[in-house]
Design a protein with these regions (language model features):
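Short, flexible helix-loop junctions that flank or precede catalytic/ligand sites
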Residues: 1-136
């Protein structure tokens, strides 16, 4: 609530949440509020949120860890999805908005796998099942 109010008054607010993925980050923010306030929070969030960067460390083939990221930039389509509570559409919108600077965790992990940075096993382990079936 304080962060949203600060953003509404022109302050740049950074926050960290223990979530993986933009959709779960949005859900976590909204779910903190009582059900009767959630629609208003969606509207406010859609007006002030600039973007979400999600990251996770994934074991790489050299025995260390490599950073996998997801970037969601709040353009008009993303703002509408948040406002309307259709967070299930965020993933698809990010995956088809590469030219706007967005990409999903799945796309990042697939690129890491194809470049030989992570193993097929770790690709499947860190990618939701729907995307992991695309490994070739």
């Amino acid at each position: 609530s304080t962060a949203i109010t600060a953003a509404e008054t022109g302050h740049l607010v950074f926050s960290t949440l223990h979530t993986i993925g933009a959709a779960s980050t949005i859900d976590r923010i909204i779910d903190v509020f009582p059900a009767d306030q959630q629609q208003q929070i969606r509207v406010q969030l859609s007006m002030v949120l600039l973007g979400v960067v999600s990251q996770q460390l994934v074991p790489n083939v050299k025995g260390g860890r490599s950073l996998a990221t997801e970037v969601m930039i709040c353009n008009g389509a993303i703002k509408n999805i948040i406002r309307e509570g259709k967070n299930y559409q965020l993933q698809n919108t990010m995956m088809t908005s590469r030219n706007a600077g967005m990409y999903s965790m799945e796309q990042c992990l697939e690129a890491m796998y194809r470049q030989g940075i992570i193993s097929a096993e770790n690709y499947q382990l860190y990618t939701p099942a729907s995307a992991a079936t695309n490994v070739r």
